[in-house]
Amino acid sequence: MQAVQRHILLVARHGLDGVHLTDGARSLRAARRDLGADAIVGAFCGTTRHEGISAAEAGADYVAFGPCGETALGDGRQAADDLFAWWSEMIEVPVIAEGALDPARVAALAASTDFFAFGAEVWSAPDPLAALRRLVAAIG
């Protein structure tokens, strides 16, 4: 999948598959209207069920929760394991774990998470390929 974060206008211009919105459900309906039914429109929903449910009801193809570990980003709250477990049990929309992931968190979330979004965990590592391999191995 090729997607861009927030920049809806770039999706069609560059032939991308979709967009990853960072404001939960707030701009989801407009993105769906502008990009059409075939585009992948996902939403980052922070750490709350409410935000995720709102995005799913607005037509998100997936929701992402995070951060999943200690990070300087955000307000210090973390997406808890039980959020992912509840979501995977109750909601059909795929769920992504995002932000501050390490092999232990990945292993703990693997059974209840559809996908993982790795970023700084890989790109900030001294050996990005080795870091990615450790994270992928933790999925099981």
Residue ranges and their predicted role:
Residues 1-4, 23-47, 76-102, 135-140:
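Alpha-helix-loop-beta-strand connector modules within alpha/beta enzyme cores
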Residues 2, 6-17, 47-61, 90-97, ...:
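Catalytic cores of alpha/beta
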Residues 20:
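A short, well-structured catalytic beta-strand-centered motif of the EAL phosphodiesterase domain
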Residues 23-31, 61-76, 110-138:
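Glycine-rich phosphate-binding active-site loops on the catalytic face of alpha/beta enzymes
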